[in-house]
């Protein structure tokens, strides 16, 4: 009994370990928000669902007295807790014969398909909605952009607002919808020759800000995560009714946000271990969170419809 159970379980652990780097590579390639991932050295986990991030507050300069010397000032460092809001998952099964008849491609394709079609878009949408709702009130603009010149003027005004808030110039990232990206191209006169008969009108950087295009379904001010049960069996996410607005563009300085993927591991069960059916079983679960740091809300600027 011990022999027949232990070997398959060990095999499934090995399979999960094998697929984990593969899934991480897909995430890095396809995610639009991965560029904002928080460095692990700045994050401290406490318990199952709490993330602590170090926050340092100081006071400003004071007059120096030649007799009394320096005026004392406070420098306080604290760990601020953030609770993971999102714990998502789904279970899938591929019949053993279906998998055999496709030379194992059915199960192998399942992993990449789930990640590309469901996990990555939902994680992106959740993060951008969190950042849109967490931006300082004065950094949120409602507008309809339909011309290149007006779009460029709007983005320039946004950068001025960030400049005045003393958000660092270096490292800002300009996330744009596909429509706004087209308007940016229309508003800028330039052309790059990439070899014979090859002309490129693309824009990768604007005013030192890297441009990242985000599909509009992932780019909403508010989303609803569907339960995946009877009332919303398809699962996934959708723009929140009435409050979910299409984002035109968003400028984010990475230091203004915190995003963490706490748990993202596939659990794989072979037909020998699966007690429910003669099938390969895949359980996908991921717990994550995204926040705008309370003292850096000016580090985000949002334009939405």
Predicted regions mapped to residue ranges:
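Alpha-helical scaffold segments that mediate packing/assembly in large oligomeric complexes
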Residues: 98-167, 178, 302-305
């Amino acid at each position: 009994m011990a022999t027949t159970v232990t070997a398959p379980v060990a095999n499934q652990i090995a399979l999960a370990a094998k697929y984990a780097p593969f899934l991480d590579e897909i995430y890095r390639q396809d995610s639009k928000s991965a560029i904002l991932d928080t460095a692990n050295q700045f994050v401290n986990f406490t318990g199952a669902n709490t993330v602590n991030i170090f926050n340092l507050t100081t006071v400003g300069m004071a007059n120096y007295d030649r007799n009394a010397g320096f005026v004392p000032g406070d420098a306080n460092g604290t760990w601020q807790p953030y609770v993971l809001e999102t714990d998502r998952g789904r279970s899938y099964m591929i019949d053993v014969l279906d998998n055999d008849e496709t030379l194992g491609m059915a199960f192998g394709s399942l992993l990449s398909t789930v990640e590309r079609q469901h996990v990555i878009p939902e994680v992106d949408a959740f993060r951008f909605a969190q950042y849109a709702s967490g931006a300082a009130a004065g950094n949120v603009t409602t507008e309809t952009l339909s011309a290149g010149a007006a779009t460029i003027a709007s983005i320039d005004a946004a950068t001025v607002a960030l400049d005045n808030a003393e958000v660092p110039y270096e490292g800002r990232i300009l996330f744009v919808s596909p429509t706004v990206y087209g308007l940016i191209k229309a508003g800028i006169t330039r052309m790059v020759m990439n070899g014979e008969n090859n002309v490129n009108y693309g824009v990768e950087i604007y005013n030192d800000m890297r441009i990242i295009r985000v599909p509009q379904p992932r780019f909403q001010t508010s989303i609803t995560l569907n339960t995946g049960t009877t009332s919303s069996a398809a699962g996934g996410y959708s723009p929140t009714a009435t409050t979910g607005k299409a984002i035109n563009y968003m400028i984010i300085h990475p230091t203004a946000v915190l995003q963490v993927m706490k748990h993202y591991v596939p659990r794989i069960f072979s037909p020998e271990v699966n007690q429910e059916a003669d099938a390969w079983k895949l359980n996908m679960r991921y717990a994550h969170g995204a926040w705008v740091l309370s003292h850096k809300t000016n580090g985000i600027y949002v334009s939405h419809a």
